[in-house]
UniProtKB/Swiss-Prot annotation:
Belongs to the ZapD family. It comes from Chromobacterium violaceum (strain ATCC 12472 / DSM 30191 / JCM 1249 / CCUG 213 / NBRC 12614 / NCIMB 9131 / NCTC 9757 / MK). Keywords: Cell cycle, Cell division, Cytoplasm, Septation. It is found in: Cytoplasm. This is Cell division protein ZapD.
């Protein structure tokens, strides 16, 4: 099976982008080659731009508090594992405290580092980080992998509270999902929403099918069509075959 996730709200879209970028950051930092650590720096710069919204911190804190209140209401529910519930509540409390401790604009530690900002500026130019353009950067790349890794972790540390918050919220959101099995007749599927709005939609189907799902959703209807995934075509075409798939609606 292959699964695709589609954010329905802007908040969910930001959470998924943060998760994607932090995942890449962890991967490249864990590697040893200078090229990998160059990629890690580029991800840091992407994170700085992605999470620079002034209201991101407030949004995350608001959603964490809302989830905390909803979960606290389950404490006396005999169908809920108390130990698991308390563990999640502790994670939420820890993530909230770390976010509250953040001061200044997100990524300010990076913006105030002139050396890093020089690399960021040159990285936007094709081939702009050659050694003759940035000799001090070339020198840094020649240091041991562990020294570079420590630097990267130090630069990334002030950003990590948003990673923890995004991870917790996406975990709770995905766990809320309800899965249904459907068939898209001749590659098309429509479902009336009845005014119900979800935050995340997952579509899963046989990974042997050379198809891609295209989705549009609002509070009135959900439309999915499966199109050809063959590269080189001018325009993807909707398949003529019936497609069995799983649809998961996730909502806090």
């Amino acid at each position: 099976m292959i699964s695709f996730e589609f954010p329905v709200t802007e908040r969910t879209r930001i959470l998924l982008r943060l998760e994607y970028l932090y995942g890449r950051l962890a991967y490249f930092i864990g590697k040893d080659h200078p090229h990998d650590h160059h990629a890690a720096l580029q991800v840091l710069f992407e994170l700085m731009e992605t999470a620079s919204r002034a209201d991101l911190k407030a949004d995350l804190l608001q959603e964490l508090e809302r989830q905390k209140q909803m979960l606290e209401a389950l404490r006396d529910n005999p169908n809920v594992a108390e130990e698991t519930l308390e563990g999640v509540l502790e994670e939420i409390e820890r993530a909230s405290s770390q976010l509250l401790a953040l001061t200044g604009k997100f990524g300010q530690n990076l913006r105030e580092n002139e050396w890093l900002m020089a690399i960021k500026q040159r990285a936007g130019i094709p081939g702009g980080t050659c050694q003759f353009d940035l000799p001090s950067y070339h020198l840094w790349q020649q240091r041991s992998a562990e020294v570079r890794r420590q630097d990267l972790r130090r630069w990334a540390a002030p950003l990590m509270p948003t990673a923890d918050a995004a991870e917790i919220l996406l975990h709770l959101l995905r766990d809320s999902g309800k899965t249904y099995h459907y068939v898209a007749r001749k590659g098309a599927f429509q479902q009336m929403s009845g005014g119900k709005v979800v935050q995340l939609i997952q579509v899963a189907y046989d990974d042997n099918l050379e198809l891609l799902p295209e989705l549009s959703a609002n509070k009135y209807a959900l439309n999915i069509r499966f199109v050809s995934a063959v590269t080189g075509e001018a325009r993807p075409r909707q398949t003529e075959q019936d497609v069995e798939f799983q649809l998961t609606n996730c909502k806090f």
